[in-house]
Amino acid sequence: MAAPSEPAGFPRGSRFSFLPGGARSEMTDDLVTDARGRGARHRDDTTPAAAPAPQGLEHGKRPCRACVDFKSWMRTQQKRDIKFREDCPQDREELGRHTWAFLHTLAAYYPDRPTPEQQQDMAQFIHIFSKFYPCEECAEDIRKRIGRNQPDTSTRVSFSQWLCRLHNEVNRKLGKPDFDCSRVDERWRDGWKDGSCD
């Protein structure tokens, strides 16, 4: 019979992490993993121990791609034996870029004069979106920011400008340059004035 602290039926040193959708990820203390985080073989005396994992990465556990940026994840790998495919899960930076592109495009096509119901729905969408964003640290940061500065969904222009200011706050936190909010329609709706998007 297993000790109270050990899950019954699983070998010692092995735990399961249950993921959304019922999938599960096995965590072991003695597995050597390849560049994709898959268990390649059991660790032996000749296998060097791994370095401490950065925040969002735990030894013996597949990394949460949405929680960790690519550079941090790569630092935990001893060597990279395969190229990454385009159809693999996004890392934190990719997810962030695509999320902002989606949100800015959503704001660019929001109605010029939304009904009260549309205004309420969009504000609710932003709040719900921040609860389910896959990077928990990012989601918590956005929830705090929108708690201090509620979405302005009164018009398309107001919503686009509110979102641009929010994005610039996050950019400053990350040490990135601000985007000129006077150019949101050019960037996300109409295309650049020089015709390069035509």
UniProtKB/Swiss-Prot annotation:
Q: Which SUPFAM superfamilies does this chain map to?
A: FAD-dependent thiol oxidase
Binding sites annotated in the UniProt record for FAD: 92-100, 104, 133, 164-176, 187-188
Keyword Flavoprotein present in the record's keywords: the answer is: yes
The cofactors named for this UniProt entry are: FAD
Spell out the GO cellular component terms annotated for this protein, sorted alphabetically and separated by semicolons.
cytosol; mitochondrial intermembrane space; mitochondrion
Q: What class of enzyme is it?
A: oxidoreductase
Give UniProt keywords alphabetically: Disulfide bond, FAD, Flavoprotein, Growth factor, Mitochondrion, Oxidoreductase
Q: Which reaction does it catalyse?
A: 2 R'C(R)SH + O2 = R'C(R)S-S(R)CR' + H2O2
EC number(s) per UniProt? 1.8.3.2
GO-annotated biological processes: mitochondrial disulfide relay system
A molecular function (GO) held by this record is: growth factor activity
Name the segments for region: Disordered: 1-59
Can you list the disulfide-bonded cysteine pairs?
135-138, 164-181
**General function of this protein:** FAD-dependent sulfhydryl oxidase that regenerates the redox-active disulfide bonds in CHCHD4/MIA40, a chaperone essential for disulfide bond formation and protein folding in the mitochondrial intermembrane space. The reduced form of CHCHD4/MIA40 forms a transient intermolecular disulfide bridge with GFER/ERV1, resulting in regeneration of the essential disulfide bonds in CHCHD4/MIA40, while GFER/ERV1 becomes re-oxidized by donating electrons to cytochrome c or molecular oxygen.
| Stated name of the protein | FAD-linked sulfhydryl oxidase ALR
- The species is Mus musculus (Mouse)
